[in-house]
């Protein structure tokens, strides 16, 4: 009874040493988890149901009431602003580099998911780069695998500007276009799953496959670790975020409390744009290190 815990402790210590040696040797650890593709447990779902006042229903998901659609919600002006932006014109000035959504056709997603992804990334690009952008933007980039080779585990967007102290600052963004209007919120059930909730209808919302939950990928967590050394060469201050885009005319689902694996936080488009504008100095593109520009250019999917 005493030996087993001791053995487990030793095993954990050895594994951590092994992981550190792999990282020091340029090989990074994968954070993938089989649990992400499994249904969350009833014990983790129950507190979410209680928090949002979801009514019990024996026919629903894990004994809780479910609906197929939320109550809609108020629209926003994001799509209206985005419609005025000419990405080709911005690309001609070097402000937009790469094509939003490029490479999704080669992914394992369904045709509907690919179409939604391209639409969402294009909307994000136009909304973020509207007006007088303070950043250069890169779209649809290759990420790194465990051995720092180019990988299809991609990065949807990178925004780069200059802070008042002269340091380059970058946002690495994973765009998400999820079901629901502003009535819907996505809330962590655990570290790997989000539940979809209609606040007005006090119910979980089912997707087209009849699921009230969605799993989260550790890709941004992994990419953050793998890019760290390269970004340090150029003194880059980096932020790694998930950005949710409105799927239709009823506003954007609320994902502001959602946290992805590795502590990657989520924000909507107006919040991201406001953060960029508050951090970056305008008209400082020439101060962005040329080596950093070349590095990001080399990762663009064409």
Which stretches of residues belong to each language-model region?
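Surface-exposed interaction regions that form or flank ligand-binding interfaces
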Residues: 1-153, 160-170, 176-302
């Amino acid at each position: 009874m005493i030996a087993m815990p001791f053995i487990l402790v030793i095993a954990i210590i050895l594994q951590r040493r092994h992981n550190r040696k792999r990282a020091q040797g340029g090989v990074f650890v994968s954070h993938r988890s089989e649990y992400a593709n499994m249904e969350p447990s009833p014990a983790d779902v129950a507190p979410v149901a209680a928090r949002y006042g979801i009514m019990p229903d024996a026919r629903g998901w894990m004994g809780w009431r479910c609906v197929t659609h939320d109550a809609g919600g108020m629209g926003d002006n994001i799509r209206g602003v985005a419609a005025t932006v000419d990405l080709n014109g911005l690309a001609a000035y070097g402000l937009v580099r790469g094509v939003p959504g490029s490479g999704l056709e080669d992914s394992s997603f369904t045709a509907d998911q690919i179409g939604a992804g391209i639409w969402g990334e294009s909307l994000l690009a136009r909304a973020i780069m509207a007006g007088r952008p303070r950043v250069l933007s890169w779209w649809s980039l290759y990420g790194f695998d465990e051995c720092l080779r180019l990988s299809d585990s991609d990065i949807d967007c990178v925004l780069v500007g200059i802070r008042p102290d002269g340091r380059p600052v970058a946002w690495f963004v994973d765009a998400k276009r999820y079901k629901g209007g502003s009535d819907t919120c996505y809330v962590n059930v655990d570290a790997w799953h989000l539940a979809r909730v209609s606040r007005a209808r006090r119910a979980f919302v089912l997707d087209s496959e009849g699921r009230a939950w969605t799993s989260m990928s550790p890709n941004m967590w992994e990419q953050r670790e793998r890019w760290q050394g390269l970004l340090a060469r150029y003194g880059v201050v980096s932020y790694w975020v998930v950005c949710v885009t409105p799927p239709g005319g009823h506003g954007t689902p609320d994902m502001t409390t959602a946290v992805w694996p590795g502590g990657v936080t989520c924000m909507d488009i107006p919040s991201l744009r406001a953060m960029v504008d508050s951090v970056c100095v305008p008209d400082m593109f020439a101060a962005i290190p040329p080596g950093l520009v070349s590095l990001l250019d080399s990762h663009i999917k064409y």
